[in-house]
């Protein structure tokens, strides 16, 4: 079974080919034009996707040594994401499927991150056992869910305001760091003191039902951003520069600690022994270290994709399409892109 995956939800134009579940190619073109603006400009993103999508798809097919006519399925991100950006890949994928008479599978971008722990490029030997608790954490999303064998996703908690990745980027911008600031903070924090300043961790209280205590599995990072802003406004520029690494480490500590703590609580409350951590922020070295230590201490099986599969990529789109096709979870239908897709079922579009 040969599947072409296409990803254009934000600022990466990516295409990948899976051959019988194995990654044969995964081409990613990152848009560098947004760095001068300190964030992604939607109109620029759409135009860059439109300019690059044909080139990237052709590169993926060539790298996999496969012809378009040999494809069995074509899949593309259908939301959520920047609506103009999503429409580029979605429209291209549908048109390609129609022209070839191949089935098209629209893929929920968040779901693709959740199942990115199943990406197989030949080097992975173990994959999450169902059911498992998944933490998906990126610039636009922070959520916990319970994942079942039929690919059903049961939400457990999510951010009530800002995503963890956004907290990294916005606090980094306050510090004068380049966009995206997450990787920069990660690097600077490695030589900083995480206890230099204690920034707040929100929604950590537990509620009592009868004789049982239940953790709040939602997240909030808007208060952290405000706290960092107030802290920095009270310091002299010389002080901030002298302690930049320590401040970065303290910010990273506040974000990563609450992510790990709530994921462990979610697994314990759900009664599962397997945890998966995905999304762009899962590439953070301190988050990985904390999860490895916590999983070992609590006896959980931990699965985190390689960094190249943590950020937006088409291999995860094709992988989820493969899992759906294996289970027969595709049906003929037309599909359009919503700006926010939530968890509604996304079906297959088949050329008639």
Curated annotation (Swiss-Prot):
Organism from which the protein derives: Chloroherpeton thalassium (strain ATCC 35110 / GB-78)
User: Has the keyword Metal-binding been applied to this entry?
Assistant: yes
Q: Report the domain of life of the source organism.
A: Bacteria
Q: What is this protein called?
A: tRNA N6-adenosine threonylcarbamoyltransferase
The similarity comment for this entry is: Belongs to the KAE1 / TsaD family.
Gene from which the chain derives: tsaD
Q: Known catalysed reaction(s)?
A: L-threonylcarbamoyladenylate + adenosine(37) in tRNA = N(6)-L-threonylcarbamoyladenosine(37) in tRNA + AMP + H(+)
Q: What is the protein's known function?
A: Required for the formation of a threonylcarbamoyl group on adenosine at position 37 (t(6)A37) in tRNAs that read codons beginning with adenine. Is involved in the transfer of the threonylcarbamoyl moiety of threonylcarbamoyl-AMP (TC-AMP) to the N6 group of A37, together with TsaE and TsaB. TsaD likely plays a direct catalytic role in this reaction.
Query: Keyword set for this entry?
Result: Acyltransferase, Cytoplasm, Iron, Metal-binding, Transferase, tRNA processing
Provide the leader sequence positions.
none
Chain positions recorded as Fe cation binding sites: 109, 113, 312
